[in-house]
């Protein structure tokens, strides 16, 4: 089974009396960012061999690199050079090409991503401006919480 299919349906845990949370760290990429990446990629429907490029400081990039690898997509991640070596290692492990910009210069990372897209060399999730990012959480998390509420009781 493909890992990206396993995104979501994370456990609900009780944090304190009547306060519950979703344990998003059990997603395949280890974070809640797996949800919007999968949701947006599913709607973009890129074909194997196509390139996806994103400016990111970490977790979205890791999720994207993982899912691109499984779908046969090329992945380019643009990020400031001061991001952790562990993140960079994970990105490369999943086969992503990494373009580093000056430390802390996230605006430049976005510019480079936009240049690659405008040159027709890749598509982007546009994670910061894409309404699907919010829709994903509203649709999927709401449904999971509604189902969990029914199973657990009044949460």
Predicted regions and their residues:
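PLP-dependent amino-acid enzyme catalytic core
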Residues: 1-155
């Amino acid at each position: 089974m493909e890992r990206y299919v396993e995104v979501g349906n994370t456990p609900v845990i009780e944090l304190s009396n009547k306060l519950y949370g979703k344990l998003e760290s059990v997603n395949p990429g280890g974070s809640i960012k797996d949800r919007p990446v999968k949701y947006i990629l599913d709607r973009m429907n890129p074909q194997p061999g196509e390139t996806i490029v994103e400016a990111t400081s970490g977790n979205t990039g890791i999720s994207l690199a993982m899912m691109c690898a499984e779908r046969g997509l090329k992945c380019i991640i643009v990020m400031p050079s001061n991001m952790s070596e562990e993140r960079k290692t994970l990105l490369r492990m999943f086969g992503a090409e990494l373009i580093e910009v000056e430390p802390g210069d996230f605006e430049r990372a976005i510019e480079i991503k936009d240049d690659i897209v405008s040159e027709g060399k890749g598509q982007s999730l546009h994670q910061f401006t894409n309404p699907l990012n919010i829709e994903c959480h509203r649709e999927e998390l709401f449904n999971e919480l509604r189902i969990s509420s029914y199973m657990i009781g009044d949460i």
